């Protein structure tokens, strides 16, 4: 039980001073120039059932294992942060081993030799979600040189995904573990069947607190292909990319970058501005207001047309552009200033 002195110490240590010097947390995961993960933060991979979320996470882990590039993921962990902890809460030991072999194949490492920097734990057999959580906590705090932690199946660390108290406590744990141990945690969570929202209160909390949220989805025209997109990202967004599954000579199924996936194929599925992600809107609006100046109505419509055409792959007509502007104004993404000019509200919440 903490006393007044404890609270005073915590209060004083929490204060930020204008003369303090801070640097950007070390960037450890990127896709192109986009920052996906830094030490001291956590990210989320989301997608509906069978979208191949675990295959995508396998590529992230493989990149971290070699501190190099796999698919579009580039890892750059400090030498003192090269150990990876992978916790799977859903699969049997047999299927967990297949995931481990897939990671090693992606990293071009032998599958008959224990990897030096990867520890893989299966927690399905543990019935109590709180025990699973405490095991993860113990491993994080008692394993040397940890840099990346993967929790594949974070909903299994709580009894009820719609319990707001449980969700807040679990996300609080993620924030505490990443901050105190200076690590990056990548979690995996299903999307709702009926929409593209992360499931339950835990999905809402992760959505609000995560550094990055990746969305993995089956391609609507080619179901054997999965598309990776930045649903939420603090840095500038990366271009969506796609992968297909291929078998190696020893029958291990791995994801392989689909180089035939093009901008036009990608953007045609998101013609409606209401279907665009936060990062896609932000990209278009940053281009629209690239000059940094207030825009009169006519110039704004012209700039919106060009910017959104680049995002969705084809231009909107005048009626659609007027509807788009009304949408942006209602969302406070664009603000109408004095004298009929418009500005970009970069601090909007989508």
Which residues fall in each region the model found?
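Conserved inter-motif catalytic segment of the P-loop NTP-binding fold
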Residues: 78-162
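The Walker A/P-loop phosphate-binding site
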Residues: 2-103, 346-348
């Amino acid at each position: 039980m903490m006393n007044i002195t404890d609270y005073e110490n915590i209060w004083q240590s929490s204060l930020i001073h204008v003369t303090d010097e801070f640097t950007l947390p070390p960037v450890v995961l990127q896709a192109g120039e986009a920052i996906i993960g830094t030490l001291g933060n956590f990210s989320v991979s989301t997608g509906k059932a069978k979208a191949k979320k675990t295959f995508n996470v396998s590529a992230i882990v493989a990149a971290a294992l070699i501190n190099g590039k796999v698919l579009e993921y580039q890892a750059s962990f400090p030498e003192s942060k090269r150990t990876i902890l992978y916790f799977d809460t859903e699969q049997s030991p047999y299927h967990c081993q297949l995931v481990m072999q897939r990671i090693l194949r992606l990293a071009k490492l032998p599958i008959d030799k224990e990897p030096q920097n990867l520890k893989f734990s299966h927690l399905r057999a543990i019935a109590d979600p709180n025990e699973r959580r405490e095991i993860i906590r113990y491993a994080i705090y008692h394993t040397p040189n940890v840099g990346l932690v993967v929790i594949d199946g974070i909903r299994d660390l709580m009894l009820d995904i719609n319990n707001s108290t449980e969700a807040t406590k679990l996300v609080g744990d993620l924030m505490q573990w990443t901050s105190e141990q200076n690590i990056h945690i990548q979690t995996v969570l299903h999307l709702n069947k009926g929409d593209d929202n992360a499931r339950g209160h835990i999905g809402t909390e992760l959505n609000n607190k995560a550094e990055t949220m990746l969305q993995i989805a089956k391609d609507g025209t080619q179901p054997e292909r999965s598309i990776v997109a930045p649903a939420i990202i603090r840095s500038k967004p990366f271009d969506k990319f796609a992968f297909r599954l291929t078998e190696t000579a020893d029958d291990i199924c791995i994801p392989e970058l689909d180089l035939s996936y093009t901008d036009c194929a990608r953007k045609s599925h998101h013609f409606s501005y209401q279907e665009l992600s936060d990062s896609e809107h932000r990209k278009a609006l940053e281009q629209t207001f690239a000059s940094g100046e207030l825009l009169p109505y006519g110039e704004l419509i012209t700039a919106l047309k060009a910017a959104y055409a680049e995002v969705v792959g084809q231009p909107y007509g005048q009626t659609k552009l007027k509807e788009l502007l009304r949408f942006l104004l209602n969302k406070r993404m664009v603000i109408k200033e004095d004298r009929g000019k418009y500005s970009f509200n970069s601090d909007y919440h989508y």
